[in-house]
């Protein structure tokens, strides 16, 4: 079942975003920052749940997306990550960034939008 919260009386918008995950949340956030009227629709009763996987974001991504992360969404500061692919090969990425509390990050993005 789809759940949505839409302010009473809203009949139109400039941007309709379906899905409040990291991609949809960012689309809604940047559309709202651009002065557009945005409606964000999520099919789960609470944005950020159920948690499907962890989430990391680099400093470069934060800069490119113009995100200033609030402390409550950050789980840990990291100075690189090691990615292990399904075939067992590994690659080390040295970009600094954050491990996020994904459910809190998604809720924050939606609230900001």
Name each region found by the language model:
Residues 80-113:
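Conserved N-terminal helical subregion
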Residues 77:
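Conserved glycine-bearing catalytic or ligand-binding loops at nucleotide- and phosphate-handling centers
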Residues 1-15, 33-34:
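Extreme N-terminal leader/targeting segments of oxidoreductases
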Residues 24-25:
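N-terminal Rossmann-fold NAD(P) dinucleotide-binding loop
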Residues 16, 20, 29-52:
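Glycine-rich FAD pyrophosphate-binding loop
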Residues 29, 33, 63, 111:
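Short, well-ordered alpha-helices that flank and scaffold nucleotide-derived cofactor binding pockets
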Residues 44-68:
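Conserved N-terminal glycine-rich FAD pyrophosphate-binding loop of Rossmann-like flavoproteins
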């Amino acid at each position: 079942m789809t759940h949505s919260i839409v302010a009473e009386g809203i009949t139109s918008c400039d941007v309709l975003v379906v899905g409040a995950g990291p991609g949809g949340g960012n689309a809604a956030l940047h559309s709202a920052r651009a002065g557009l009227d945005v409606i964000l629709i999520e099919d789960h009763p609470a944005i950020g749940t159920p948690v499907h996987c962890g989430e990391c974001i680099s400093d470069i991504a934060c800069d490119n997306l113009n995100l200033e992360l609030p402390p409550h969404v950050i789980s840990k500061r990291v100075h690189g990550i090691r990615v292990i692919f399904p075939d067992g090969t590994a690659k080390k990425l040295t970009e600094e960034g954050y491990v996020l509390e994904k459910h809190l990050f998604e809720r924050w993005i939606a609230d900001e939008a």
